[in-house]
Amino acid sequence: HKYIADGYSKVGHSMVIDTHLHLIGSDKEKFPLNRYPHPGHEWVAVSPNSDEYLLTMKNAGVDKALLVQPHAAYQTDNSYICSVSSKHKEIFAIAIIDPENSASQNTIRQFREGEVVGLRLFSIPSPTISWIGAPEKAWIWHQAQKQRLVMSVCILPNELKEIGKCAEVYDEQIVVVDHCGFAPIFDQSDPISKNLLELARYPNVVLKVTTLVIDSWIQNKGSIAGLFPFLAESFGVERLVW
């Protein structure tokens, strides 16, 4: 994304980007929690705030970061992540909107250019009928394209094929698959894993390999070795982020 690359000038040094970060504000009056009980939501209680993360970020040599809206903590209230991205030029926000709220289109328009760089289509728990690629939700994709927002999709395995449909219809839109769609990629024979790998045929689909994916691979394979080479065989290294 152009805003993430802007201003980077370290000669001989590759930019290191944390592509999936969740933070929780310490000021609960200004940024009240609106919890959703997703499995594993306990992390919300121990998550760092922006000041704590920035120190860790500097010590680890991370140049920039994508602050992903945590649905488990704030659902569709993006106030905290937008506040952080407005104060810290090295952090960029990925927001969630309510697809059923008619005011969401205006919400997207109000995102400040260069601070919010992506939308996260959050479809968990899975709906009875998938909405991410539904014609009546096309306005989300069109508005995202108009504002040059990357589209991140967080779904469970039963909606993986919907991502392919979206990637085909909106072929100029980058589509990032959060958590590799929760596919059990350690088992290459699993139909869900095959559905994920089939998305490689769409050049605008990118896989996000988060710690959930890495931990699952290690638990089943005993080592991280082989994970990224396996995914790169299908998607290439240029379409993997972690």
Where are these regions (language model features)?
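A metal-dependent hydrolase metal-coordination microenvironment
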Residues: 56-106
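Hydrophobic faces of well-ordered beta-strands that scaffold small-molecule active sites
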Residues: 17-21, 65-68, 92-95, 117-121, ...
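Catalytic pocket-lining loop regions of alpha/beta-barrel enzymes
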Residues: 133-242
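Active-site mouth loops of central-metabolism enzymes
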Residues: 37-46, 92-100, 125, 129-131
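An N-terminally biased module of ancient metal coordination in phosphate/nucleic-acid-related enzymes
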Residues: 3-70, 75-76, 112
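Active-site beta-loop-alpha junctions enriched in small/polar residues
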Residues: 22, 70, 96-100, 122-126, ...
